[in-house]
Each structure stands twice: as C-alpha cells, then as structure tokens.
Amino acid sequence: MWLQVTNCSTLHSSLSYCGANTLSDMAKNLILWLVIAVVLMSVFQSFGPSDSAGRQVDYTTFVREIGQDQIREARFNEREITVFKRDNTRYVTYLPVFNDQKLLDDLINANVKVLGTPPEEPSLLASIFISWFPMLLLIGVWVFFMRQMQGGGGGKGAMSFGKSKARMMSEDQIKTTFADVAGCDEAKEDVKELVDYLRDPSRFQKLGGKIPTGILLVGPPGTGKTLLAKAIAGEAKVPFFTISGSDFVEMFVGVGASRVRDMFEQAKKAAPCIIFIDEIDAVGRQRGAGVGGGHDEREQTLNQMLVEMDGFEGNEGVIVIAATNRPDVLDPALLRPGRFDRQVVVGLPDVRGREQILKVHMRKVPLEGDVEPSLIARGTPGFSGADLANLVNEAALFAARGNKRVVSMQEFELAKDKIMMGAERKSMVMSEDQKESTAYHEAGHAIIGRLVPDHDPVYKVSIIPRGRALGVTMYLPEKDRISHSREFLESMLSSLYGGRLAEELIYGVDKVSTGASNDIERATDIARKMVTQWGFSEKMGPVLYADDEGEVFLGRSVTQTKHMSDDTARAIDMEIRALIDRNYERAREILAQNMDIMHAMKDALMKYETIDAAQIDDLMARKSEIRAPKGWGDTDDVMKSSPTTSESAPEAKTESAPEAKAEANVETEEKPVAADSEELKPKAEQAPKEDDKPQA
C-alpha cells in the first residue's frame, strides 16, 4: 500500500508540475499579448484625433454671440477655438480660414479676453519613439512568431521539423526490469553484459574490451523486443531515448538526416545512455539501385545513421538498440560489426517460456484454484508473449461478463477457443441443410486428421459460426514442432482435402460447394514448396526452383531473372499435381472405408454443435454411447448413436455464394499453432487450424 501511495503522490506531483508549467506558459503568453495590445492602442490613439472639452458649435453662432456681447473669453489653438460665455458655459468651434483679422478686431472691440496657445513640440524621446516604434514592433512580432514556430522553450513548433522526435526517459521513469520479461532467457543473457557495462564500464575497459555499440533485437511480432529494451534501460539506470523508425522521414528534404544528427547530439550530452529505435526497417531498409531517378530521402537518413553509429567521430557511451521483425531487408552496412555488433534473436517461447509468461501476466488476475499455467502453456503452442497476454485478458473479460470474482480454467478455455478459432456468432441463423453440410465437411477433416500418420491430434470440431467461419476443425500439436517431415506434410495435404471429399461422397460431385477454396489454396502452396524448395520430389531432386520474389526496392537486383525453362516449369506443375492426386486419393479411400464414423460424427455435431477430443475418441472407436461435452446439458449425458449407412444419407441441396466463402476462408490462416523457431516454414506448412467453411 505504501508503494501505491508513493506512486500516486509521484504521479500527482508530476501532473501538478506539468500543470504549473502549462499555466505559467499561458500566463506569459497572455501578458505578452496584453502589452502588445496596449502599446498598439496607445500609438493609434496618439495619431488619431483628440477629444475636445465641451460641446461643438458652428462658426456662425459664435460670430453672432460676439455681436450680442455673450462671449467672455476665447482661447485659440491653431484652428480650434474654445469659447467661454458670460453664463460660465463653454463650447468649441473651428475657424474656417487661418488668420481671420476681422474676427480678432471684433473680439477686441467686444472686450473679449483673447488667449493663444503655443504649438506643442514633441520631445526628443517621443520623436525617436514615434520614428522607430513601427520598425521595432515588426521586428518583435517576427521574433515572437519565429520562436513559437521553432518550438521555443522546448515546445513543438511548426519550424522544429529538423529536431529529433526522440523522447527521453530518465532512469526514474522506467520501472521495467528483467523480472517483468519472461520466456526469452537466452536473449536476456545476451543483453545482461550490456547492463553490467553501463553500471561498471571500468571492469571491461581495463581488459581492453569494448562493449557492443549496437544490439539488434530480431524476432516475430509480439515476442517482447520492445519490453526487453525497456528492461535493459530500467536495469542499467541510464537515460533512455526512444523513437520509431518512421519518425525520421517526413515531407521535407533533409529532415531525416537532421533528426538523426540532433538525436545523437542529445544522446552524447546525456552519455552514458541508450537509444532505442523501434521498427528500424522503416529507415534501415537496404539501399536500392536508384531506379526511377530523383532523390531518395530515406537513403540519406540511413547514410547519416551509418555515419553517426560508426563514422569519423566516435559515440563513446551511446549504445543503440534497435528492434525489427524484418532483418532480411536491412542494409548490410547497418549490420556490420561496429554498428550493430550483436543480433539477439527473441523467438517464440517454448512450453517453459509460455508458462513463465503466463505467470507474469497472471499476477494481477485473481485466479481459481483449478488454474494451472503449465496446462495452458502446453495447449498454446505457437503463441507469442502478446498472444498470451491477450489470452489472460480475454479470460478476465469472460469472468467479468459472468459476474465472477475469480477467473477459472473454464474462462481460459473459452478465451483460447476465441483466439484460436474466432468469436462465436450465436445470432447467425443457419438452415438445417447448411448445418448438415457443414457438419459433413468438418467431419471429413477430423476423420482424415485422426487416421493419417504423423498428424497433429484433432483438438475440437465445431459447426458454430466463429468470426467469418461457419465451421472449424482445430488441430493442436502435442509438442512444439521445430521442423516438418515429408510424412507430416503429405498428411496435411490429405486432411486439407477431407472436407471437400466428404461433401463429394455424400452429395455427389455436382453438389460440392466452394467452401474448400482455401483448403485447395493452402494445399497447393504446400505441394509447390515441397517440390520447388524442400526437395521432396524424386523427379526434380533436391534443387531450388523457387522464383526470385525480391523486389528492386529491397535492393540486390534491378530485374528479376527466370530460374527455370518452360519444360522445367511444366515438369514442376506435373509433380505438384501428382503429389496432390496421390494424397487426394488416399483421403478418398480413408473416408470411403469409414462412412459410418462420418455419419455418426455428423449426428454428434448436429446435436452438440461442438465436440472435443474425448468425444472424437468415442466416435473413432465406434462406441454405441458418446460422452457429452463438458458443461453440456440438463437432460442426457450420453447420446445413443444410431447406425447409419451411406444409403440413408440425405440429399441436401445447398447453394452458396463463392464470394462470401472466399472472404470467409481468408480467416482460416490467422493462427498457426505449431511454430516456435525462426527456421520454421511459413504459415501454410505449419500445423494450422482447419476452420474452412463449406457454406456461406
């Protein structure tokens, strides 16, 4: 509690300090504008006509009153006459002409006291002020606005585009430590000596060693690269400059290089310190071949960064940490020793790492006694740190939605299903024909997945619409897969076609829907890579036939070259077709031999809508009684499975919109679940979930 009060008071004092500074700046600006307004009003008033005392009377009345002996005194001030009457009233009139001698004679003859006022001569100071004030005023206004535009006093003005946007955080502002970072022990070990150097540089210097001037954190999104950089700064207790790679380049030429110079100048003044550049691939992308002409502002920014990091002048005490998930596109000059001496890979966590990450995020969540982080970690292969944080948060939201005080294992299961398979769309109404067709489709995926060798176990099958999917077959690996065998990949090809084949066997070739479009796309991609990249074709051999997919703006080449002849490309297409046909026929034979299981699984899906691994085990064992899923129902705990045959298969006639299905199938590849290494193959060759929708 004391720590919370201290933090709150610190926050309150910080807010009060910021508020006081803001009010002080506002008061200064207000006073300045008031002074300018008063001076301008004084000047305009001095040049404008002055107000005269008394009322104004026409000259004719004045002459007539002289003859009537009503005037006692007349005071002349150039053409203005102030008249005092004998009844002690006064008024003002003006001479129509100068030097009216007759008027003076009439006034003297009428015994009127005549007074003259000498002309007012301005003082020397007033003359100088009147002469120079307009120019001084213009200069002052120009200086004021230039200071405002340039962000005078540390502000962000319109002319401050050449200044660095890096935010400096002092050691007191960074509370993150290595205790808050879990699941990347090797990466923490790599950067701990950096912290030791910042704490005690002499220990390294007396042995002639130099600390790396730059560290590049490499890894997939969500693995904690930015968090690790903050932990380094929090442990080292040094100033920490943070900036994004996209903050350097803007609309003006030369801004990026100017900001790089300004950032390193600020860092040198605060040395020893850390500069953290997030998403450095935005500015550090490999320099191109100059196609298209013109001036590449990003390249000039990169050149300036190369010079600042290791150029003619050293940056003693300034350590640059950068993070990226695209190290392949960075310029080689940026990655050489002397700039980024060390590359630290922050990969996806393994089972133990996921358990540690879950424990970190569960600190702030009240948990039921049945929650086991180790079980959750084993059931979430391929999850990054950000995914696990989202999992804990979703579980807490499920518990709050149910007005619970603690989060149980049930909420974590619901959260995992939502993340891996999508949110349930309970409001969507499907016809019985659509549900039945979807059930057969998903049953085909599940049966093939259970019967082919070296395939990930089937975790759950559902015909509840989730996200943009109408049906889901989820595979969950038993362990983290570092690489994939040929047997596993061919089993994936067979299981991907299981849904289409189930529809074909039940409804006939003419009634097959477009729901398998994404299955076909993914299977074709896997087969093509097996032939052209991974050497799994005896005819083509272990040769790389992949096309050059690098663009010129990523550097290295101006034109793309063709790596194969037309005959070779034709042979590759034939090998891909043969590979797919072989596994397609294998899947057909498996389903044809297990039609009774497919009908039983369809009936279970129609009743329960979602079945798990335990029910699938009962179905595959052809048991007469099938266990109900967890949390199911009030009435029957078991369902009597009625034996059905292919003759009794319904003749469901369903039409579907290809556009809707194609859009829905995009969602099937969002969560690969069998990947924990940088050497892993792309999404298509990982063990993915099968949320392919036969109907839309």
Swiss-Prot record:
Keywords: ATP-binding, Cell inner membrane, Cell membrane, Hydrolase, Membrane, Metal-binding, Metalloprotease, Nucleotide-binding, Protease, Transmembrane, Transmembrane helix, Zinc
Residues annotated as transmembrane: 30-50, 125-145
Taxonomy, superkingdom: Bacteria
Keyword Chaperone in annotation: no
Pfam families reported for this sequence: AAA, AAA_lid_3, FtsH_ext, Peptidase_M41
EC number: 3.4.24.-
Cofactor: Zn(2+)
Periplasmic topological domain: 51-124
Gene Ontology annotations of biological process type: protein catabolic process; proteolysis
InterPro entries (alphabetical): AAA+_ATPase (IPR003593), AAA_lid_3 (IPR041569), ATPase_AAA_core (IPR003959), ATPase_AAA_CS (IPR003960), FtsH (IPR005936), P-loop_NTPase (IPR027417), Pept_M41_FtsH_extracell (IPR011546), Peptidase_M41 (IPR000642)
Membrane topology: Multi-pass membrane protein
Enzyme class: hydrolase
Note accompanying the cofactor annotation: Binds 1 zinc ion per subunit.
Biased composition (Basic and acidic residues): 650-696
Cytoplasmic domain ranges by topology: 1-29, 146-696
Chain spans, region Disordered: 627-696
Ligand binding (Zn(2+)): H441, H445, D519
Complex formation: Homohexamer.
NCBIfam families in the record: FtsH_fam (TIGR01241), PRK10733.1 (NF008004)
Full protein name: ATP-dependent zinc metalloprotease FtsH
Organism: Photobacterium profundum (strain SS9)
